[in-house]
Amino acid sequence: MAKRIFDTSYLIGHWRIFPKATKRTTDNMRAWSEKLIDQYGTRQIVTPVYIEMVAGVTSSDELKLTRAYLDPFEIIDEGKIPKRDWDEAKVMSQRVAPKGGKRQLGDCLVRAIAKRFNCEVLTSDKGFPAR
């Protein structure tokens, strides 16, 4: 079985279903992400996923919660994205799906990095580029 990494769409979807009756604290958000990790048996993400999550916050409080949520994850590329990943993302960006639709820079780069690490990408994004 291939290793698996989470895409931003999976993390955002999980973030949004945090129980409404529970207060969002750094400890609770960290524990919440650990539940996702336990459920899927992986804690791996890539740098673009981390950046997309952090870039989506709208306040300093939300930033603290997001960082706590992301703490348990392992960034497998360690922030090192070589030229070959960019080249692969470029190739993916030029693939037009039969039904059309736009490709996103982040999605293409996530897929390229995942390919380098021989990982399956867990995503809920229907337009995510195929291998």
Locate the predicted segments by residue.
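Short secondary-structure capping/turn micro-motifs that flank functional sites
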Residues: L105, P129-R131
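Short loop->beta-strand "edge-of-pocket" segments that line small-molecule binding or catalytic clefts
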Residues: R4, T42-Q44, P72-D77, E120
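A general structural signal for well-ordered alpha-helical segments in protein cores
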Residues: R30, Y50, L63, W86-A89
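Short, well-structured N-terminal submotif of metal-dependent ribonuclease cores
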Residues: M1-I45, A55-A68
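Active-site neighborhoods of divalent-metal-dependent phosphate/nucleic-acid chemistry enzymes
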Residues: I76-L122
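Short beta-strand/turn micro-motifs composed of small residues
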Residues: T47, T123-D125
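A generic structural signal for short hydrophobic patches within well-formed alpha-helices
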Residues: L11, Y50-M53, F128-P129
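Conserved glycosyltransferase catalytic-site signature
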Residues: T8, T47, Q104-C108
